[in-house]
């Protein structure tokens, strides 16, 4: 699947020639006063960083310039793969903490197993979090974070099966990974029925794996999904599954669970878009039309439309825009991981409380446009 989370996710690659021409103009242009903020250290963004409105929305560039002690923190990218050969990710991926779980859920540390150049989703996610600050390309939200590639998708089709997901959470728990990002839903069922003997074991196994990671102080951030669905009131019928073979059929899904956003121990993130003409640093943001929502099911709302980050080497020296809650959740994960850097004395529960407190600050909360009958904001905008 091109869109691991599912729904209306899309990619818009930017040609190398266009980027080269843009680099010179962007590098020569001064940063806006709104984006500069109160910095302790002068920071010149990488040339194409101006394409990333999300960095201004999260005040990420200001945070990068703050001179503060930062503890080492690794974010686990539970996704298709991460191509650490692209320029902005060279040196950002910790090979000792990276793994593929995509063969029967058995860990394989061979880089060839977790580094694919023909599946760009995980690379884009990793780059949006931690693309390095090196004078070329773009900046991630926090280039000082480390990345662990945790491949939890099949090579053919990009399916995310329970045994792969279990392997990923257990690996993160046992290898010192502080935060995971999960931009996917669990295959082959869109909605898992806990009373169906063919589905109950898979659902329970994934829930136990999340519980295990939580017990090891891991914070697990996940995409809310792209089906324009109220996660508080899931549909009672579905005709999209099983999704990995012919024969999808309508079935009763009353009482089903949508994994992972509805699992205990996950933080679910909905997607925001920038209205035309709005200032990304100060303007009011609105929910993307395709984003899932839910007053009790969503924890944060973060930018998820037109998110600019690196693509795999298969595309050449390329960057591109992706759209989806797959892009929103890594931005929230990056903010949470930054809090873990700055507050190593805090446990996961305390960090989550702090992240929600900051997201709900009026300076952040008031930027989220309320929508009647569609509560998508969670605690607010991570910052």
Q: Language-model segments: which ranges?
A:
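Surface-exposed intrinsically disordered loops and tails
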Residues: 44-52, 100-118, 188-201, 230-259, ...
